[in-house]
Amino acid sequence: MKQGIFMIKQQIEELRQLLRHHEYQYHVLDNPQIPDSEYDRLFHQLKALEQQYPEYASENSPTQRVGAKPLSNFAQVKHDIPMLSLDNAFSDEDFFAFVKRIQDRLIHVHHSLTFCCEPKLDGLAVSILYINGQLVQAATRGDGTTGEDITANIRTIRNIPLQLLTDNPPARLEVRGEVFMSQAGFEKLNKTALAKGEKTFANPRNAAAGSLRQLDPKITGQRPLMLNAYGIGIAEGVELPDTHFARLQWLKSIGIPVNNEIQLCHGIEKVLDFYRTIKQKRSSLGYDIDGTVLKINDIDLQQQLGFISKAPRWAIAYKFPAQEELTILNNVEFQVGRTGAITPVAKLEPVFVAGVTVSNATLHNGDEIARLDIAIGDTVIVRRAGDVIPQIIGVLHERRPENAKSIIFPSNCPVCDSVISKIEGEAVARCTGGLICAAQRKEALKHFVSRKAMDIDGIGAKLIEQLVERELVHTPADLFKLDQVTLMRLERMGAKSAENALASLAKAKKTTLARFIFALGIREVGETTALNLATHFKTLEAFENATFEQLQKVQDVGEVVAKRIRSFWSEPHNVAVVKDLIAQGIHWDDVEVKEVRDNPLKGKTVVLTGTLTKMGRSEAKEYLLQLGCKVSGSVSSKTDFVIAGESAGSKLTKATELGINILSENEFLALLA
């Protein structure tokens, strides 16, 4: 018996130590190692044991306090009124139990309860003190009793007023709220960090917490932080409204930001409707939330209900299903996207996350695999938010099994066996078999027949879908091998449509070298670059055999584009398809290099608008490109010339308003003469 009691006592102490460790990682180091759901499970396990064995209760247990101790780097601030956390509900039944506890304490209240309902922002709780309307101090929640002085950092947040917008400010007003970062701001912050080679943040909450705890306020000021107030602590020299909702509206009226989704809900069903609505809107809000906060609206009733040691009795956080969970990485497969991007896909032990069972998650690229230091067999943290593809955001390395296997990134495409290429400085590796890779086939063919490439009118996107799905076309060269009988077997393809398609294919065999190069779909080789390559090398053979150094001598061809071109030609599959295309009769006239004299249009940004009667728009564009012009599709202050044909519309009007040089078709032709 004694041994059993000893083991229970030991289990309780181990749980306390484990929870303290994770609190320190989360609150102090801003480096959470487990999902919130895992922490909640450990917390409730400890709480249940302490309730079952009260003789082992301890005032220092994680269940008896709000959070972790503050950092020693900041001055400490004692909260006059403790900043408590909230009890959690994870189901309707939990919420009903919360309501019953309230009703049992308010037996004299016979009307239905009214709640102030708010989204539960996933950020950092702060206290901001105003004296006579001036912001004088700000602190983190810390352990609920003592926080960290972050006044200088809070002053840098643009949506927090340094002076209240009222002519009659309170003598003292303590505003409590959540500092957070929008998803767009978070993505921009990480993108900038990547470009500078700096460490990125795992999620917006970590980014907000890390930004708010910077010792240098200038760094905080560069971060896109925001505040939403959720309550009031101290208030002196002011008569506050007698409901929570009205108090939030009053805060808003004096310049304090309040969340726009907050609603007043009368009765339990309306509260649950709010929960479901916010849950549905979650992915479109633009910021992270992990549930709703439901508060008794009447301040008098709040005071009657009071507090327990850790939380108010009049409020609860009804949390959404966990967006992060632990599971095992069983394997990694490599998928090929429509542009040839190679994406590692984690095959997971199925786990229920955010309302669905997840068995696959993206690992993004090889750099991400290295950053995570992940191996097959690892225990991983998988995250699913809204409609975003599940992803692995962390690894519990201490749980790595002895038989864990390293993840080997393939050197050849798993679909077509072409070489995989990765440009230095880029994260994404790509298959080089663009013309033959089945994974890229549809997009490669759609590009090949497009108007700016081979301009094959009779072959549209829907026809290509059918041709590929029925395995009738594998490469662009196969298009020219189609016959009428084959085409007429397809949906919505009668004799006339088949004839038109074949006629378009026959007509397209006569093209230009520039169009042909563009049609090959070499990554980074756009219409202008293709024309520059054709003009420079003059023949397909010279272009195919050009060295890396020779390619870089071409206008607009830098190191990256040159590498893309050499990767394309070094893949035997691509060379074979090009030879097949020539064998099918694709041809062009010798490249005529027009002499580019000094010309007012040379190197300028030009917009074509209206109908040109003496020259087709494509021909006009080709002339302009040979002059080194940038041909744009829209008019802006950066436009140098607008060439206006007949029936020119809004582009001509805008050019006139901006004072841009306007040329008629005849004036344009005169400059080319």
From Swiss-Prot:
One of its GO terms (molecular function) is DNA ligase (NAD+) activity. Pfam families: BRCT, DNA_ligase_aden, DNA_ligase_OB, DNA_ligase_ZBD, HHH_2, HHH_5, Nlig-Ia. Its EC number is 6.5.1.2. Keywords: DNA damage, DNA repair, DNA replication, Ligase, Magnesium, Manganese, Metal-binding, NAD, Zinc. Zn(2+) binds at C413, C416, C431, C437. It comes from the Bacteria. Its cofactor is Mg(2+); Mn(2+). It catalyses: NAD(+) + (deoxyribonucleotide)n-3'-hydroxyl + 5'-phospho-(deoxyribonucleotide)m = (deoxyribonucleotide)n+m + AMP + beta-nicotinamide D-nucleotide. SUPFAM superfamilies: BRCT domain, DNA ligase/mRNA capping enzyme, catalytic domain, Nucleic acid-binding proteins, RuvA domain 2-like. Residues 596-673 form the BRCT domain. The keyword Ribosomal protein does not apply. It is an enzyme of class 6 (ligase). Gene3D superfamilies: 5' to 3' exonuclease, C-terminal subdomain, 6.20.10.30, BRCT domain, DNA ligase/mRNA capping enzyme, Helix hairpin bin, Nucleic acid-binding proteins. The active site is at K120. PROSITE patterns: BRCT, DNA_LIGASE_N1, DNA_LIGASE_N2. One of its GO terms (cellular component) is cytosol. The keyword Ligase applies. DNA ligase that catalyzes the formation of phosphodiester linkages between 5'-phosphoryl and 3'-hydroxyl groups in double-stranded DNA using NAD as a coenzyme and as the energy source for the reaction. It is essential for DNA replication and repair of damaged DNA. Belongs to the NAD-dependent DNA ligase family. LigA subfamily. HAMAP family: DNA_ligase_A. NCBIfam families: dnlj (TIGR00575), PRK07956.1 (NF005932). PANTHER family: CHROMOSOME TRANSMISSION FIDELITY FACTOR 18, DNA LIGASE. This is DNA ligase. The lineage of its organism: Bacteria, Pseudomonadati, Pseudomonadota, Gammaproteobacteria, Pasteurellales.
